[in-house]
Amino acid sequence: MLKLDLKERDSLDLRCIAGHHGLANPITISDLNRPGLVLSGFFDFVAYRRIQLFGRGEHAYLLALLEQGRYGAIEKMFTFDLPCCIFSHGITPPEKFLHLAEPSSCPILVTRLTSSELSLRLMRVLSNIFAPTIALHGVLVEVYGVGILISGDSGVGKSETALELIERGHRLVADDLVEISCVNGNSLIGRGVHKSIGHHMEIRGLGIINITQLYGVGSIRERKEIQMVVQLEEWNSSKAYDRLGTQELNTTILDVSVPLIEIPVRPGRNIPIILETAAMNERLKRMGYFSAKEFNQSVLKLMEQNAAHAPYYRPDDTY
């Protein structure tokens, strides 16, 4: 629990009332558990590695057990290595419960949030923490709201392209090394690997520059969902590049498919403008409009019309 960011702690509004020595207990599973069955004495398949969430129902049953002097289930529950217990709705557990929990060093936490809201927020936080992660070389920028991961060989111009995009009002997320996490199984969230050196760029011939200081806080983002990958490569005259845009390429990162665009680089090509156009075109696709397919259908329709009119005219017809 100590590893939570300050923002995440504030969103959960947690307050420790007992078991402070156990705040460093490891949390190894992102799921939650409602301990109703455990309190009733059923200890088969105990999900003891999960965070134990006590709502109003569990609290009412807990009070009934304590009033009847039935401490057995509670004492046995604390023989397991529980990461922590959280009481929602601002409920403060009875002193007897805190006394039974103290020897196990299980933190007892209280939050003002409802059980449903706490579950949603906890799952969001834990999903981010336990998300599979990979680090890739590239530059992550936000262009017209679209997260673009610029990749390519060293020296192809990734940082220079990103710098021009920042100059044009877009935002930098990470340069050189991007940490990518798969959240909820289908979203790729990218960020800088090291916060202390984040939002710095290395420009050959110029050195290290601080984007925040040069362009202001409006030119950066802490994290962004990756919605497109742009592969910059040296122009290869023997390679056939897509000129219509009807061929949709994809790449896979952490088992998530992402649209891929291959852009050949050579003198005279304005790569930043091409990336801006690619970002706007991607937004159109997400809105249901595919420019290349619309153009292709228009051409086919025109060809069909010409083919239908052809039998009615002869080459020597004059008007």
Swiss-Prot record:
Cofactor(s) of this protein: Mg(2+)
Source superkingdom: Bacteria
Reactions accelerated catalytically: [HPr protein]-L-serine + ATP = [HPr protein]-O-phospho-L-serine + ADP + H(+); [HPr protein]-O-phospho-L-serine + phosphate + H(+) = [HPr protein]-L-serine + diphosphate
Record-listed ATP binding positions: G152, D153, S154, G155, V156, G157, K158, S159
Renumbered residue ranges of the record's region Important for the catalytic mechanism of both phosphorylation and dephosphorylation: 201-210
Root EC class: transferase
Subunit structure: Homohexamer.
PANTHER family, A to Z: HPR KINASE_PHOSPHORYLASE, PROTEIN YJDM-RELATED
Stated name of the protein: HPr kinase/phosphorylase
Organism: Treponema pallidum (strain Nichols)
